[in-house]
Design a protein with these regions (language model features):
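Short, solvent-exposed recognition patches
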Residues: 17-142
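Surface-exposed amphipathic alpha-helical segments
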Residues: 144-170
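Membrane-interface helical sensory segment of bacterial ECF anti-sigma factor regulators
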Residues: 1-13
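Generic hydrophobic/packing signal
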Residues: 1, 122, 163-165
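Charged/polar, solvent-exposed surface patches and flexible loops
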Residues: 7, 43-46, 161-164
Length: 170
């Protein structure tokens, strides 16, 4: 994978806060010019054994930019671009170590639940980003033995629409 991309992305995402950085040495990283999400989801299923929950709805202009699979950590990360921001979708097996760099410097302004059509509880947290007057949303849920996280600066209505339209593979 391109470490320079990660360094830039990580610095931008975390700022000067101390964060535990994900080891990207053994991740297969792909730029996704000609890759479609269906192909990525199939790869996640075959290589990681995760039944991927698919993003069926995405706001206009939100496009997948890059994805990474780490078979050692049993983890997949899809990065989307949306209005000059990055939306990060991560999935990993429950037994996998989820040592994400958590930044708790933003102010938690709201927490709520969204229940998907098949009864999965999705916990959502709304943060106000320091220095920027924007809201960032983080959603977490569990399905078929895996953990899922979707994080990004997206309008609340759009974020809820993404979550309400998730497709849960059987």
């Amino acid at each position: 994978g391109s470490k320079s991309y990660w360094k830039v992305w990580w610095d931008r995402d975390v700022g000067d806060e101390k964060a535990s950085v994900i080891n990207v040495d053994d991740m297969n990283s792909q730029k996704t010019e000609d890759l479609d999400e269906v192909h990525i989801y199939k790869k996640i299923r075959s290589e990681l054994g995760i039944l991927p929950v698919r993003l069926v709805y995405s706001p206009e202009g939100m496009e997948i930019e890059k994805y990474e699979l780490n078979t050692d950590l049993q983890k997949a990360m899809l990065l989307y671009k949306y209005k000059e921001q990055t939306v990060k979708y991560t999935m990993y097996m429950n037994n996998a170590d989820s040592s994400f760099g958590e930044k708790e410097t933003d102010k938690l302004t709201d927490e709520f639940l969204i229940i998907s059509d098949n009864g999965v509880e999705i916990k959502v947290k709304e943060y106000e980003e320091k220095d920027k007057k924007v809201k960032r949303y983080e959603a977490e849920f569990e399905y078929a033995g895996a953990q899922y996280e979707i994080k990004g600066v997206v309008e609340k209505e759009e974020f809820e629409k993404i979550l309400k339209n998730l497709y849960f593979s059987k």
